[in-house]
């Protein structure tokens, strides 16, 4: 079972085309607790998102833009912007912090289950 930190989710990230993914919105304190695990793989490549997590959780993560393929039993902590941004928009630290404070950044816990 793998554990990942993500800034988005797509069905293309599932290793099996026959999977069910359960999502639960979680408070930031649960995300911060998960970051203490040595087994959590950071797959966030956006600098402002990493900076936001570092401020919230008092961590020192670095950007790590890697491809993730989720398998049966894997879990993910997903930091999500809840509004559609203009094409090509890169959020500054100030913009993403304001969005977080305004409730426009949500954190989800997801677990993958293969059904075949």
Swiss-Prot record:
Report the InterPro entries cross-referenced here: STIV_B116-like, STIV_B116-like_sf
Per the UniProt record, one Pfam family is STIV_B116-like
**UniProt cross-references to Gene3D superfamilies, sorted A to Z:** Uncharacterised protein PF08960, DUF1874 (3.40.50.11170)
The name this protein goes by in its record? Uncharacterized protein ORF116
Instruction: Please give the organism.
Output: Acidianus filamentous virus 1 (isolate United States/Yellowstone)
Q: What is the lineage of its organism?
A: Viruses, Adnaviria, Zilligvirae, Taleaviricota, Tokiviricetes
């Amino acid at each position: 079972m793998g554990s990942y930190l993500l800034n988005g989710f797509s069905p293309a990230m599932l290793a099996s085309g026959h999977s069910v993914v359960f999502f639960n919105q979680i408070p930031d304190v649960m995300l911060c607790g998960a970051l203490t695990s040595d087994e959590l793989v950071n797959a966030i490549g956006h600098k402002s998102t990493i900076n936001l997590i570092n401020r919230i959780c008092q961590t020192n993560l670095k950007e790590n833009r890697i491809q993730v393929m989720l398998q049966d039993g894997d879990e993910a902590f997903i930091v999500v912007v809840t509004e559609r941004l203009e094409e090509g928009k890169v959020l500054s630290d100030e913009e993403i912090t304001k969005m977080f404070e305004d409730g426009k950044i949500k954190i989800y816990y997801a677990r993958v289950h293969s059904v075949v």
